[in-house]
């Protein structure tokens, strides 16, 4: 995001890491790693957000990239650390390291290889952009010899430059409007896809006469 670079890049580059708080002081971690939840072969409203769903340049999660699901009972009872909430930052810890996205919506699960960072005393959108900026530093925590992996206990010690509250609030206000617009566009596109999928077979079968549709 150009706004982030324009507003903070110079200050971040000049900041002394000795005076910066650690990431772990600024977030609560939602961590359900350790074992795999019972999955369903059906597509439910409760997707597992894995590493594949965090790849790409977009800021928000595209749930079309989720391929695993749990049922309602598992969603409500299995996940010991809870579920992501809006504006949490989801980050991968195994495989393709430090892939990250912002969680928006109401249903989604994190289990193996992904944790959620919930900002408590910092703008979540500032923190997201900051983590994107230092992604190479996070990847450098890799301890895996066969499969790349990073420990959460390592990355939470990474220093984070925190600007004045007034600057954070000004950035958050603009960034949240832009991000909400992206999410609205995503939801509108999903609605149009569902409408297309519902109408196209009826058009092809002749059940609906295209000549009577006012387009």
Question: How does the language model describe each region?
Answer:
Residues 1-38, 45, 161, 165-211:
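Non-catalytic DNA-recognition/assembly elements of restriction-modification systems
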Residues 24-41, 52-86:
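Sequence-specific dsDNA recognition surfaces
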Residues 50-51, 68-135, 139-146, 151-153:
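A short beta-sheet element
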Residues 52-55, 94, 154, 164, ...:
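Short, small-residue-rich loop/turn micro-motifs
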Residues 140, 211-212:
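Short, hydrophobic secondary-structure boundary micro-motifs
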């Amino acid at each position: 995001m150009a706004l982030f670079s324009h507003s903070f890049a110079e200050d971040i580059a000049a900041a002394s890491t000795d005076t910066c708080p650690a990431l772990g002081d600024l977030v609560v971690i939602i961590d359900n790693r350790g074992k795999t939840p019972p999955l369903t072969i059906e597509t439910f409203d409760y997707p597992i957000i894995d590493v594949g769903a965090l790849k790409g340049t977009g800021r928000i999660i595209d749930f079309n990239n989720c391929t695993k699901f749990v049922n309602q009972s598992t969603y409500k009872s299995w996940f010991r650390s809870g579920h992501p909430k809006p504006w949490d930052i989801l980050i991968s810890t195994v495989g393709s390291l430090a892939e990250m996205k912002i969680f928006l919506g109401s249903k989604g699960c994190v289990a193996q290889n992904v944790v959620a960072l919930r900002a408590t005393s910092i703008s979540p959108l500032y923190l997201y952009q900051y983590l994107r900026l230092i992604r190479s530093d996070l990847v450098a925590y890799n301890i895996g010899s066969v499969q790349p992996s990073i420990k959460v206990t390592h990355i939470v010690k990474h220093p984070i430059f925190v600007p004045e509250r007034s600057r954070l609030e000004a950035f958050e206000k603009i960034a949240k409007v832009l991000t909400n617009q992206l999410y609205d566009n995503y939801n509108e596109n999903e609605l149009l896809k569902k409408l297309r999928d519902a109408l196209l077979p009826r058009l092809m079968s002749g059940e609906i006469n295209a000549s009577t549709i006012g387009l």
